[in-house]
């Protein structure tokens, strides 16, 4: 398709009879930042390794710029990979690590010097050219790995959980750096991550995977606000799942005997084969009788930026709620939400 730099078509993979990928279909546009997100064992790293050329699929096609990628050897693919371990050379300094690929291609000395220094500036390592790799921090090593990959001018940069080894604050900073670099350079990034916040904060689109299948592809906003199935709703963030609600008609649902307005349509009439999702941060705590349901605070947990409450309402339903207000166990409250807080999806077929 037009502008697709990379296309995976019904890609499958198994190891000794154990199916790892169950027919992956994915189109990636030139210049996109795509993240494969999922729990351990979901197939995201295998997908990346197949694209990189480290693994062969059992079946399916991978097209790069409209041509079959699979017969092309790793060193001929216009990709570079950044690993979680960085894979830097400990006996080389920063400059020589970054220059390694250009030297193997016998790049002219003046061009090599110019390109390496350009990347050193790009990743903010000016003054570190002669520094020994073992004397660098984790974040600095990550910058060297990025510069070493980008100096080869790949058309696609593959990133295998590149920030996983960093501490929390440094990881957050490097997320911003990765996104900045990707925007400035304009090449396609394909990253693997198990970190939801990481994927949602820096990706143009997120590919949510589980048990070898793609569960949903969409923008971070779509993935979070419009999960396509129960698994995605539970995996991405936190959710209140109403499994016994009724879709009365377009823009109307029923929860515990009360009718609520929603934005959803095309689920039929009086349909029970649906789940209703309401995020904890979308529920407001009100005084008794001021909301939709009265309830009692059963549990409170301070999370730093907010309190997490468990409130029991009608029919013993327990609601998880995030609020900046402090409450005590046994406080009497009521709960309320806006129409757009309700999201309806079909129940998963067993």
UniProtKB/Swiss-Prot annotation:
Enzyme Commission identifier(s): 7.6.2.11
Subunit structure: The complex is composed of two ATP-binding proteins (PotA), two transmembrane proteins (PotB and PotC) and a solute-binding protein (PotD).
NCBIfam families in the cross-refs: MMSYN1_0197
Naturally occurring in which organism (per UniProt): Mesoplasma florum (strain ATCC 33453 / NBRC 100688 / NCTC 11704 / L1) (Acholeplasma florum)
Gene Ontology MF terms: ABC-type putrescine transporter activity; ATP binding; ATP hydrolysis activity
SMART domains found in the cross-reference section: AAA
The reaction(s) this protein catalyses: ATP + H2O + polyamine-[polyamine-binding protein]Side 1 = ADP + phosphate + polyamineSide 2 + [polyamine-binding protein]Side 1
Name of the featured protein: Spermidine/putrescine import ATP-binding protein PotA
Membrane topology: Peripheral membrane protein
Record keywords, A-Z: ATP-binding, Cell membrane, Membrane, Nucleotide-binding, Translocase, Transport
């Amino acid at each position: 398709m037009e502008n697709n730099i990379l296309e995976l078509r019904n890609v499958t993979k198994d190891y000794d009879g154990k199916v790892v990928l169950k027919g992956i279909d994915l189109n990636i546009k030139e210049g996109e930042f795509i993240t494969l997100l999922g729990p351990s064992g979901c197939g995201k790293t295998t997908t990346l390794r197949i694209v990189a050329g480290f693994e062969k699929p059992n079946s399916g096609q991978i097209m790069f710029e409209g041509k079959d990628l699979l017969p092309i050897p790793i060193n001929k693919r216009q990709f570079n990979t950044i690993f979680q371990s960085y894979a830097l050379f400990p006996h080389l300094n920063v400059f020589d690590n970054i220059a390694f690929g250009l030297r193997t291609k016998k790049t002219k000395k003046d061009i090599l010097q110019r390109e390496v220094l350009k990347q050193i500036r790009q990743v903010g390592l000016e003054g570190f050219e002669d520094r020994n790799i073992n004397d660098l921090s984790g974040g600095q090593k990550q910058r060297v790995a990025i510069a070493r990959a980008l100096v080869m001018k790949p058309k696609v940069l593959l990133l295998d959980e590149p920030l996983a080894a960093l501490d929390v604050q440094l990881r957050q900073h490097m997320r911003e750096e990765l996104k900045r670099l990707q925007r400035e350079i304009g090449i396609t990034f394909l990253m693997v991550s198990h970190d939801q916040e990481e994927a949602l904060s820096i990706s143009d689109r997120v590919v949510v995977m589980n048990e070898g299948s793609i569960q949903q592809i969409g923008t971070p906003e779509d993935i979070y606000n419009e999960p396509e199935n129960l698994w995605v709703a539970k995996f991405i963030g936190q959710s209140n799942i109403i499994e016994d609600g009724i879709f009365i008609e377009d823009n109307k649902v029923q929860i515990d005997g009360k009718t609520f307005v929603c934005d959803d349509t095309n689920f039929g009439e009086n349909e029970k084969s649906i789940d209703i999702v309401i995020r904890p941060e979308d529920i407001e705590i009100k005084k008794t009788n001021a909301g939709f349901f009265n309830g009692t605070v059963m549990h409170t947990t301070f999370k730093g930026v907010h309190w997490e409450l468990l409130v029991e309402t009608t029919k013993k339903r327990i609601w998880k709620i995030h609020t900046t207000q402090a409450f005590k166990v046994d406080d009497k409250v009521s709960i309320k939400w806006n129409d757009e807080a309700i999201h309806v999806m079909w129940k998963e077929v067993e």
